[in-house]
Amino acid sequence: MNITDIYETMEYSPAPESPDLALEWLKDRKAKFGLFINGKWYKAKSGKVFGTNNPATSEKLASISVAGKSDVDSAVSAAKKAFPGWKALSGHERARYLYALARQLQKHARLFAVLETLDNGKTIRETRDIDIPLVIRHFYHHAGWAQLLDSEFPEHTAIGPVGQIIPWNFPLLMLSWKVAPALAAGNTVVLKPAEFTSLTALLFAEICEQIGLPPGVFNVVTG
């Protein structure tokens, strides 16, 4: 008996979380995702897509748009256009958006955890019990800093649109490390998730829509 035979004959305990919630989310979107630019979803101008797969099974999860130079330029233009208005908001007003993001992340924590596991291959215990709770805490934490920024750092100045590239090993957690402080400080964002682990960034873009984040403040280009 070889290793493959052993794996095929082993008895496995029930999974601590069902993938059904994430699979239903993918099905509702026909497992096809565009680019999130200026608060709306667009197909890549080239029409190109690539597949993202479950690393545990090699099963295709979704088709994702491949952004080209003109798509990235559009996202940067949207971030530049949104910057003056976002910067002009008081820290308290920006904090309300960050707090709303934290609440939505908390509300959909199970979906984020299961989707991250399917797309990245981490164990559900790591995504559910470590990564996603930390993501939520980062947004709550930086909502607090946004509110205190004017009094604690009265000379601070927002930089402007920032480009953020996310690695595959901590897809949503690294997003929170970069996006939360950038938005709290009055910057706008163009985010590029890792090719292999884009799905939770796209789900995050959806919740940005749901809370009414101003168009162009947060943009996602995939590829």
Over which residues does each language-model region extend?
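Alpha-helix N-cap/helix-start motif
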Residues: 45, 72, 109, 128, ...
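Signature tryptophan residues that serve as conserved aromatic anchors
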Residues: 41, 83-86, 145, 168, ...
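Glycine-rich loop-to-alpha-helix module at the N-terminal edge of alpha/beta enzyme cores
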Residues: 59-149
